[in-house]
Amino acid sequence: MRLPPLSRRHVPAAAALASLAFILAGCGGDDVTATPPSQPEAQAPVGTTATLALLETTDLHTNVLSYDYFKLAADNSLGFERVSTLIAQARKQYPNTLLLDNGDTIQGTALSDYQALVKPVGCDQTLAIYKVMNAAKFDGGGIGNHEFNYGLPYLSQVTGNTFEVDGLPAPAQQKKCAGPNFPQVLANVISAKTNAPLFTPYTILTRTVTATTPDGKTVSAPVKIGIIGFTPPAIMNWDKRWLDGKVYTTGLKEAAEKYIPEMRAKGADLVVAISHGGLDNSAYSPTMENGSWWLSKVSGIDAMLIGHSHQVFPDANSTVAQFNLPGVDKVKGTVNGVPTVMANYWGKHLGVIKLGLKFDGKTWTVDKSQTTVEARPIQNADKSYVAADPSVSAAIAAEHQATIDYVKTPIGSTDYRMNSYFADVGDPGAIQIVNEAQADYVKTYVQANLPQYASLPVLSVSAPFKSGFGGGTDYTDVAPGALAINNAADLYLYPNTVYAVKVSGADVKNWLETAAKRFNTIDPTKATVQPLVSTFPGYNFDMFTSADLAYEIDVTQPVGSRIRNLTYKGAPIDPNAQFIVATNNYRASGGGNFPGLDGSKTIFASPDANRDVLIAFIKKRGAITRAADGAQRSWRFTKLASSVAHVQFASAPNRLGDAAAAGLTGITQVAADDGSGKNLSTYEIDLTQ
């Protein structure tokens, strides 16, 4: 059931979610022009000042509750239900607020997959995440790359739009469905059919703020705030199967330079860019993934809300490369002088930009001397967490329970613990079963439908999607015993579909060289602590687990020259030999920028999700064993003749037993706390063993 919009005059209409509907003193959440104040703007004295707090959520990924559907357990370190408490606190602190979401909102948990794929929401139903956001009275939002993961028809429906794109009926023939009660803006994704933006590129919100005149009087005055949204142009690769031929993207700078002058001409006092991307100051490209550094240089932007990178900004102690670029002030929270915030991910932080405003007689401008930026965590200084807003869980109780019931569906059993705690150093325990399922599926299809490729060997590749980025609980961990759908979702995190590509032996080598970017270059002659794992994402650390394929990774060599002794069936791999590799749509279409993988090598684009293929494979096999499904190591680190280096990496605390069970040697835990504040320990690996 769709919740009615909350208003300042009709609070009882949403009594069930009353504690989410915090009253704004001056700034409402409705997508309407606020009631004109008693004193019109033109009469506000020159020098009148005000404070407007921009509140940001980003990369919520449908973590509505503090709950892990993979482990079927509470996880107090995340969840919108706790951010909702921070929102309430900020609204009490500041008389004027604007609550905005940065995107990557509708995908990311078993709840989102249940509502999109298992029991799709009806046209008259509002997604669980949008239901609670409506109740929280968001003022606006952007669109992230993951919004496109389920396809354009679904996105059109759940956002309450009627996209005019190929594959959908004409807008007049589409039914406008339930969606968010706040405007969503996106300026750089264009319909190929109409050459018009897929979403509204920007909107201008008129809000009444409480202000102070130069003589100290309190007055009400309208402020016009323009919001404009951007998403990574790389969606055209990542979700090519849904988007190719239907939409295209423009660069962030180009879109901003087109629309911001329009926004100003239409009376926007302020312009807030909602950019779902991080910071990258390399040579500008209209297709660059993280273009927010360049966006900040476009004239006319007063503040930026950024995301996508799953990081915290500002953070004075951050060692993250993008926050230590020229022009980036990680203490004050500015990018090339523009106040900027990134509020982490999964509901771990609330971004707050407190804008100091000054009225010059015609318009409101930002007083940077009165502007501050912070990302407020849901974790308190004493390591406890802020209380959850109970109305959030009450609002989606039915959806939550239905998801739990679904993921408890039994599918098989395992005799070993399938985890990714030591995937970075060679444990295939949570990878091999995925590779087996993909290979079995592709082999069957090729034999039945692609006789021209039937003689080619089929390999399979996947990555440890959960490799500790989010801390000690961010690992795949499936206990021995009965297997259910939630375990399969833990093994395969994303709603990808199976793709098969035809590649050469040389392509396989290049594929592995790219995956080996996961590691830093180690100098074995230096008796210093040297971090093994780089910032290269774990979800791009592709691994083969075939008895026919073997290779070594030499981390003493530079990127691009690390793969040694690459063999197929015991002989050096032939660069010209042809192989079929089972993978996913993201990788086959260019995700991760692997050489040669740009969509052109795809021979089979399956409609079936990798996770569903995995579930079917486990059901067919019934009993999964370490000997058959979790012990095939295709790769090892090159053994060093000697080394005095202290090569270290992070993983969850007290997991050495898992390393031993996987047959890994030379690993010790050297510190119970790695100092990151993410519940990780420091381990050391001896590369001479």
Place the predicted regions along the sequence by residue.
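C-terminal motif of bacterial Sec signal peptides marking the signal peptidase cleavage site
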Residues: 23-26
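Gram-negative bacterial Sec-dependent N-terminal signal peptides
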Residues: 16-18
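Glycine-rich phosphate/diphosphate-binding loops and the adjacent beta-loop-alpha structural elements
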Residues: 406-427
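Short, solvent-exposed aromatic-acidic interface loops
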Residues: 231, 368-384, 567-570
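Bacterial N-terminal signal peptides that target proteins for export
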Residues: 3-14
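Active-site or pore-adjacent capping/gating segments
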Residues: 350, 368-369, 373, 386-395, ...
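Feature captures C-terminal
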Residues: 48-53, 63, 71-78, 82, ...
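Acidic, metal/ion-coordinating pockets
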Residues: 31-32, 36-374, 433-440, 451, ...
